[in-house]
Amino acid sequence: MKLLALVALCAVGVASHRDKRQLSIGTISVSGAGGSTGCVVTGNVLYANGIRLRNLTSSEQSELATYQTEVEQYKTQLRNILSQRRENLRNRLMSQGRNQQQQSNDVSSQGGNDDGSIPKAPEKPSFCTAEDTTQYYFDGCMVQGNKVYVGGQYARDLSSDEISELQTFDTQQTAYQNAVQSQMQSQVQGLFGGSDFLSALFGGDRFNQQQQRQQPSSTTPASTSSTTLPPKPTVPQFCTAIF
C-alpha cells in the first residue's frame, strides 16, 4: 500500500515539472509571525513577493487602513473561537466520569456561544490581486507582473505579444494540470478498489451518497477522462538558460 501511494505521488511530481506557475498570495497570520510573500506594504510602498511595485495612492492608503482594522477584528474573533473550543473540550474531558445526562447538559451550556462557524477573512485590498502576485518560473528566469527577473534582479518588461503568449500559456497550463490531477485521482481510486474500498474505509453509505452527488454520471466518462489528457502547452521562451 505504501509503495503504491509513493508511486502515485512521484507521478504527480513528474507531471508538474518546472514550467508550472506558482501562485503566491499573502495570508493572515493569527500568531503575528509573517513573511514577505504576497503583498506587503511598508511606508506606503507596495511590494509583491519582495519586489517593489509602487507607492500607494491616497485612496489606497485609506483602503489599507480599513483593511488593517478588519484584520485585527478577524484575529480577535479567531482567538475567541479557539479559546472557547479549548474550554469546551476541557469541560468534556472533565465530565467523562459523570452520567450521560449531566454530561449533555454541561456541553450544551458551555458550547452555547460557539455555533461552529469560522469568521470570514476580510477581502484583500483592490491593489493586491492575483495578477500582481502570481509568479511564473521558467528555466533561467521568473515572470511576475509582466516583468522578467533573472536571479531576483529585474531584467526587462514583456512585450505586448509576449503578454498575450503568457496569458494563453496560463490558461492552457491550468487546464492541463487540472486534467492531470483528475487522472491521478481516477487511477488511485482504481488501485484501491474504487468506491467500494473507499466506502468501507470512510463511512459506507454516506461516502457513496457524496460521490453520487459530486459525480452523477461517473460510470462511462471516467474511463475516457482517465486516459485522455489535453496536449501539454508550449512553454514561452522569455529567456534562455545555458547549461
Curated annotation (Swiss-Prot):
GO cellular component annotations of the record? extracellular region
Q: Pfam families from the xrefs?
A: Pepsin-I3
Which residues does UniProt assign to the signal peptide? 1-16
Q: Where's it found, cell-wise?
A: Secreted
- Region annotation (Disordered) maps to 95-126, 208-235
* Keywords (A to Z) from UniProt: Disulfide bond, Glycoprotein, Secreted, Signal
Which CDD domains does this entry report, sorted A to Z?
A: API3
- Glycosylated positions are N55
Q: Does the keyword Secreted apply?
A: yes
Q: List the disulfide bonds.
A: C141-C239
Bias (Low complexity): 99-112, 209-229
InterPro entries in UniProt: Pepsin-I3, Pepsin-I3_sf, Protease_Inhibitor_I33
UniProt family annotation: Belongs to the protease inhibitor I33 family.
From the Swiss-Prot or TrEMBL record, give the protein name: Uncharacterized protein F32A5.4
Question: What is the organism of origin for this protein?
Answer: Caenorhabditis elegans
Q: What is the lineage of its organism?
A: Eukaryota, Metazoa, Ecdysozoa, Nematoda, Chromadorea
